């Protein structure tokens, strides 16, 4: 006779979050309210679809699966093998790549694995200077990339704020790096991947492109693809790609074995199979016409904001746009001639219901926790459904706040921002999905 289940165990396994941990449930509900009622304009953030949230909150959370499909160190992987193969196949198809590894937990982990595969400690790495828009993992001295490797940097022209490929070539010829990274965290222009490839070939370097910020634009065919030019390409899945927070790697087949080994066991243990399921869903969505339309609105919105922030009334207040515009999903705002610094401007926009992040501008005189700039992005609002009309309104709210400064009517601007947010409901019915504990 089968014993009755232990009531204590079954109660915990079936009880909702609000009952098990009301503190966390309340905080999730508050965060949902914040996301719904404010305008999210941090360039590295987006909203994952319901299907991705469901995949990432699924029973795959329970499964350990060290290794690769068909070559696991654990039993019971027959279903997660199919999940991972789907994710890999979709990544290869979406970006036209020869191989894909979908196990990196983040973009930083992806970069760490690629560098581990392509370089040895002490060898030379050339990347975009953090102060000019580069990423921590491109050689910043406190990051693993700055500690394990000898680092050189290229930057932007001090007048145009554009990357000068002749200057990159000169730096590479002098520094002779083992790997060149082309990519950025805060640079509003398209990179010349063919020129980077030519320079890498000339100095005998491997080329890694970090497309974490613009991968969604590449997937939609609205941004040049780095895949034909790079040896390896890394990305996150949660920025313009609009999936869950995670990373992936694509590239040439000749590097697959080294990179697979660098991810596991080199950098990570077991992959997060629930997250990989979410990646598979996001990659499927990224191949749809709806996704391409969203990316078009993302680009258009960024250009609308850049144009408004270059208008005479804003320029008169000492506000300018780095490089004079944007080719991508973000606008980098220069406040060096404004009464506002980056921290003050971020706080002001937060008060009116718009979330952005302060960001260094090229050759910024202020410390990193203050900065002289803002980074403003459009992916999350495009995901909500914003088009040119709504982005024009958002641009005017931002322009009014930055041009007026401390004397701005915060209440009036917040009313405008809140009306816009509520006109495009976010996660309608999420409470009923049992994903916020209510």
UniProtKB/Swiss-Prot annotation:
It holds the Pfam family SHMT. The record marks 238 as: Plays an important role in substrate specificity. One of its GO terms (biological process) is glycine biosynthetic process from serine. NCBIfam families: PRK00011.1. HAMAP family: SHMT. Catalyzes the reversible interconversion of serine and glycine with tetrahydrofolate (THF) serving as the one-carbon carrier. This reaction serves as the major source of one-carbon groups required for the biosynthesis of purines, thymidylate, methionine, and other important biomolecules. Also exhibits THF-independent aldolase activity toward beta-hydroxyamino acids, producing glycine and aldehydes, via a retro-aldol mechanism. This is Serine hydroxymethyltransferase 1. It comes from Mycobacterium tuberculosis (strain CDC 1551 / Oshkosh). The lineage of its organism: Bacteria, Bacillati, Actinomycetota, Actinomycetes, Mycobacteriales.
